């Protein structure tokens, strides 16, 4: 996606484009990424966190208990993503052990400036084409509708990722899908990372 952003001019010009700089990609689930932020802050290196919105809502289970169920973003009440919850609590000055519910609209309306803390920046899915996916796969499908044979009247349910594993989906993008589009939240995050210009 970095190369696709560079080729299409998303980053503008610079002496050291992102693809010419050293960077490491580390895959950590949204439940644990925030645990590494103090270490990143200690190192003082730029860190981009691309994570899933993971919208959920309270539902009654078969046993009669209230449980959090994964739902489309328009029906979401909050997120199950611990890193996003940690980030919001930090921005609001709340203790890490705070368990109050964070409304999904607070998350989806987070101002750009609130997505950066020191050398760390967080991005997650945003609305595009009138819809918002709650995962990378749904976001890519949303902005690459032609490739996935999805029309203009696509619903959030149509974007739902089914079938292949997340790894297979990503490898298909790299190896088989030259015409996919990069979701706005990824462009935004990679632009932030590119603008850190560590070498200049």
What does each model-identified segment do?
Residues 1-200:
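Acidic, divalent-metal-binding catalytic cores of TOPRIM
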């Amino acid at each position: 996606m970095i190369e696709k952003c560079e080729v299409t001019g998303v980053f503008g010009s610079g002496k050291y484009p992102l693809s010419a700089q050293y960077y490491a990609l580390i895959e950590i689930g949204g439940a644990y990424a925030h645990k590494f932020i103090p270490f990143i802050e200690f190192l003082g290196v730029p860190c981009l966190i691309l994570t899933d919105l993971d919208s959920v809502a309270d539902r009654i289970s078969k046993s009669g208990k209230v449980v959090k169920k994964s739902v489309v973003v328009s029906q979401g009440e909050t997120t199950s993503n611990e890193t996003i919850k940690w980030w919001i609590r930090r921005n609001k000055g709340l203790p890490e052990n705070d368990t109050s519910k964070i409304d999904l609209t607070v998350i989806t309306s987070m101002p750009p400036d609130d997505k950066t803390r020191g050398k760390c920046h967080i991005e997650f899915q945003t609305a595009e084409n009138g819809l918002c996916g709650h995962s990378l796969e749904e976001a890519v499908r949303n902005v690459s509708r032609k490739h996935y044979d999805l029309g203009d009247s696509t619903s959030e349910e149509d974007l739902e990722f089914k079938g292949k594993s997340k790894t297979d989906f990503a490898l298909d993008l790299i190896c088989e899908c030259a015409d996919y589009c990069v979701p706005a939240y990824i462009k935004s995050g990679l632009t932030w990372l590119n603008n850190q210009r560590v070498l200049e």
